[in-house]
């Protein structure tokens, strides 16, 4: 009953109706408190009445603070029994009024699906910007959310950009409701996947955009996986309905089949391709058209075009049947052969979407300024507000026991730094406030470093513009200046020892050496490296111990090229780069026993350590495992710890190529010590020597990264594309042939894909495109392995000569 009341309150959104809905569960209702207070007042004098009402407000505030404190205790002591419904039920009515109208959303999709174009329309229709500008900066301005010159030149989003806007929508009774939307536009290219990861980590919902022609593409599948990782409810928006070959029903089917999430269309297009005019809302059975120079005027009518009336009835029935599969209330109505009301359908869509059982599918064309406003209405109707989303933390005072975060302003502050960015005013740290209030001038504590930090300035970001604010409440997103931290750090006000889990960070797959062309640029080069590694966890920098070269690592060629270009533009540092290097790995395939003794004596105390045991492949490639099975104390604990350090040092740089070792296990079950000559260093060195010998005797292998590659090109170039893949010994997993284009899905070794982009363009007259993402490590071909090992041994011999 409580959930129904909340949903009814959400959809009707008038304070009188919310009061009546909540009075079922609790009396007196929140909204009636001031009315009750006024009716009880014994005074007729105005000033005395005001004083009495003010006193009642203070009493009510204390009561809500007491309730909030009890909820906080339950969140710590027994989080599993604290439901989101109970959290909402005990919200201060003023807080409920604010939070119920907040939406934290991201826009994510495959590259070139129209994310930034759609975001530009959202900002225009909400009044956040006064004019629409297109991607690639064709009008010398460029889209608002692409603030970097590189983004506007290349027509791609490189960094996620945050903004906020207010959307006024009409409810079913025709009354206006204002919603506050915090919006993050994310990149589509796989090389910048960390930007999507950290955006989704702090958001409550998302709009997943699909191309009406291509449907579900490779990066769509990656985005879906990321949304599932963080339990993000999503609305699907089939964009580019005005393109030749647009087929929204194929996209809906692919969401169901490829992404394996129940989906149904909430709209039917009125016309397609050049004749796309608008959509029919299947919930309310109304035709919706965009009018005006930029589609800013919405015209609704009950007159549905005659040629699609039957299709609309059919698709509405499909929607109800799909909802009956995922929602009990609609299932009952469906089994009783009754027709659900509009309110029941909307409530069911909302329940199923928030519980991750369903995704509603909208349709439109952002570039043609059509059907973006109904998508905004759907964000407000079907995606959750912050109080409806479960967020967990770990309590360090209770052995990192899980605790639930409660989105009340009155509780102790907890926030997560999810993105760092350098600005002209210094380091900018983006923070999602999960609990409590963040105020200008307050002190916060970094849970990782235990450092106390004062917040000098709080701003709301609008791409690269900012608006200063004095404070920000639970459920909101902001940015602060002057905070020294790392991406993923948790902040509290010091009253709670909470820490939040950070976002998933994939491992880099490609490296190259880099140095400034001119020695005088070294200070700026170092500054750039320091800044980029702080901002981007997937961009790694290290110095090779032998060559003393600076090595940068990242997610792909484009990823590293962008940083090299940014150094030139932002720091005026011209760089020389070496050939890209693949991040190979090493492993062993057979068990090998070892009995190794390190013995050095040169007068005085020497070195002595004996280690006995075996090495073998670990259960999975994802781990290296050290284990001791010593009995009788033949090796003391401190020496065993030194053995483990020796093992970890050995896995960091393998014997074959000097790359990391994966999937290897070492067990030490015996050994010997000397009363004078044994030391921790001796046992560490002995373990490393034993590791090298055993590893080389255990049929070692070089592992190379395989990339999940997706190539799309016009049908007439299919033979050329397949030929390119065959030359690279790619394994073709699937091929989809459409009316005009085909798509090939293949596994390719990263080593073979250098320079593929230019060859693909040449073979397809510039019409082909491809994307890659890391799939898994696989044994390298024997010939390649021999070449790599021989090259490494030759380099080592030259260095030691």
Swiss-Prot record:
Pfam families cross-referenced by the UniProt entry? EFG_C, EFG_III, EFG_IV, GTP_EFTU, GTP_EFTU_D2
GO process annotations (BP): mitochondrial translational elongation
* Major place of residence: mitochondrion
Q: Which InterPro entries match?
A: EFG_II, EFG_III, EFG_III/V, EFG_IV, EFG_V, EFG_V-like, EFTu-like_2, G_TR_CS
Question: So where does GTP get bound?
Answer: 109-116, 185-189, 239-242
The cellular location(s) given in this protein's UniProt record come to: Mitochondrion
Instruction: Give the UniProt keywords, A-Z.
Output: Elongation factor, GTP-binding, Mitochondrion, Nucleotide-binding, Protein biosynthesis, Transit peptide
Residue span, tr-type G domain = 100-387
Q: Does the keyword GTP-binding apply?
A: yes
Organism superkingdom? Eukaryota
Q: Which GO terms describe its molecular function?
A: GTP binding; GTPase activity; translation elongation factor activity
Listed disulfide bonds for this chain?
A: none
Q: In which pathway does it act?
A: Protein biosynthesis; polypeptide chain elongation
Keyword Coiled coil set for record: no
Range annotated as the organelle transit peptide: 1-65
Q: What does this protein do?
A: Mitochondrial GTPase that catalyzes the GTP-dependent ribosomal translocation step during translation elongation. During this step, the ribosome changes from the pre-translocational (PRE) to the post-translocational (POST) state as the newly formed A-site-bound peptidyl-tRNA and P-site-bound deacylated tRNA move to the P and E sites, respectively. Catalyzes the coordinated movement of the two tRNA molecules, the mRNA and conformational changes in the ribosome.
Q: Which family does it belong to?
A: Belongs to the TRAFAC class translation factor GTPase superfamily. Classic translation factor GTPase family. EF-G/EF-2 subfamily.
- Name of the protein in question: Elongation factor G, mitochondrial
Q: Which gene encodes it?
A: mef1
């Amino acid at each position: 009953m409580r959930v129904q009341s909340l949903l009814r309150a959400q959809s009707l959104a008038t304070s009188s109706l919310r009061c009546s809905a909540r009075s079922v569960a609790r009396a007196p209702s929140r909204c009636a408190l001031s009315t009750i207070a006024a009716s009880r007042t014994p005074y007729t004098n105005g000033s005395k009445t005001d004083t009495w009402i003010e006193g009642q407000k203070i009493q009510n505030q204390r009561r809500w603070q007491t309730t909030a404190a009890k909820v906080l205790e339950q969140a710590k002591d027994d989080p599993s029994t604290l439901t989101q419904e109970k959290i909402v039920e005990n919200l201060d009515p003023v807080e409920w009024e604010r939070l119920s109208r907040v939406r934290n959303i991201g826009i994510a999709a495959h590259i070139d699906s129209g994310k930034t174009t759609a975001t530009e329309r959202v900002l225009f229709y909400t009044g956040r910007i006064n004019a629409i500008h297109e991607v690639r900066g064709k009008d010398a301005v460029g889209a608002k959310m692409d603030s970097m010159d590189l983004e506007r030149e290349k027509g791609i989003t490189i960094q996620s950009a945050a903004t906020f806007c207010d959307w006024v929508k009409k409810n079913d009774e025709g009354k206006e409701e204002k919603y506050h939307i915090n919006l993050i536009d994310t990149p589509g290219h796989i090389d910048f996947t960390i930007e999507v990861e950290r955006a989704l980590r702090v958001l409550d919902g998302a709009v997943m955009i699909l191309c009406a022609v291509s449907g579900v593409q490779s990066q769509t599948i990656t985005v879906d996986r990321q949304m599932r990782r963080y339990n993000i409810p999503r609305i699907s928006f089939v964009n580019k309905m005005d393109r030749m070959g647009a087929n929204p029903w194929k996209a809906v089917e692919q969401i169901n089949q490829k992404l394996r999430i129940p989906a149904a269309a909430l709209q039917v297009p009125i016309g397609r391709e050049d004749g796309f005019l608008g959509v029919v809302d299947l919930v309310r059975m109304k035709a919706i058209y965009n009018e005006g120079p930029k589609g800013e005027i919405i015209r609704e009518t009950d007159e549905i075009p005659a040629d699609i009336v039957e299709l609309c009835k059919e698709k509405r029935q499909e929607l109800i049947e799909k909802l009956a599969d995922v929602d009990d209330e609609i299932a009952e109505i469906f089994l009783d052969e009754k027709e659900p009301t509009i309110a029941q359908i909307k409530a069911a869509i909302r329940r199923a979407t928030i519980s991750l059982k369903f995704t509603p599918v909208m349709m439109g064309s952002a570039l043609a300024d059509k059907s973006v406003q109904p998508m905004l209405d759907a964000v407000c109707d079907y995606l959750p507000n912050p109080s409806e989303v479960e967020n967990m933390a770990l309590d360090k005072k209770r052995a990192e026991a899980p605790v639930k975060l409660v989105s009340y302003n009155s509780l102790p502050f907890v926030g997560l730094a999810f993105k760092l960015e350098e600005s002209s005013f210094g380091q900018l740290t983006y923070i999602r406030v999960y609990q409590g209030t963040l105020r200008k001038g307050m002190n916060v504590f970094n849970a990782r470093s235990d450092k106390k930090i004062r917040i000098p300035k709080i701003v709301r970001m609008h791409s690269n513009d900012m608006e200063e604010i004095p404070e920000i409440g639970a459920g909101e997103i902001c940015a602060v200046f002057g905070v020294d931290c790392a991406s993923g750090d948790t902040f509290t006000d010091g009253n709670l020892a909470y820490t939040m889990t950070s976002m998933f960070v994939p491992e880099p797959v490609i490296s190259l050496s880099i140095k400034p062309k001119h020695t005088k640029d070294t200070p700026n080069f170092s500054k750039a490296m320091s800044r980029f590694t702080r901002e981007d966890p997937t961009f790694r920098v290290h110095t090779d111990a032998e060559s003393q070269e600076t090595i940068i690592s990242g997610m792909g060629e484009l990823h590293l090229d962008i940083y090299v270009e940014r150094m030139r533009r932002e720091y005026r540092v011209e760089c020389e780069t070496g050939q890209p290097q693949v991040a190979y790995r090493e492993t062993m395939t057979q068990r090998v026993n070892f009995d190794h003794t390190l013995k050095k004596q040169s007068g005085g105390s020497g070195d002595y350590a004996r280690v006995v045991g075996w090495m073998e492949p670990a259960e999975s490639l994802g781990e290296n495992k050290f284990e001791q099975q010593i009995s009788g104390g033949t090796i003391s604990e401190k020496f065993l710890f030194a053995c483990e350090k020796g093992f970890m040092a050995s896995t960091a740089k393998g014997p074959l190529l000097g790359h990391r070792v994966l999937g290897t296990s070492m067990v030490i079950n015996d050994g010997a010590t000397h009363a004078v000559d044994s030391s921790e260093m001796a046992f560490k060195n002995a373990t490393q020597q034993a590791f090298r010998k055993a590893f080389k005797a255990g049929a070692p292998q070089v592992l190379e990264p395989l990339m999940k590659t997706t190539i799309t090109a016009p049908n007439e170039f299919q033979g050329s594309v397949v030929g390119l893949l065959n030359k690279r010994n790619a394994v073709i997993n699937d091929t989809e042939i459409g009316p005009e284009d085909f798509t090939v899905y293949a596994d390719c070794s990263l080593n073979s894909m250098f320079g593929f982009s230019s060859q693909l363009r040449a073979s397809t007259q510039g019409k082909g495109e491809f994307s890659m993402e890391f799939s898994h490590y696989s044994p390298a071909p024997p010939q390649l392995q021999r070449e790599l090992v021989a090259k490494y041994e030759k380099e080592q011999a030259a260095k030691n000569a």
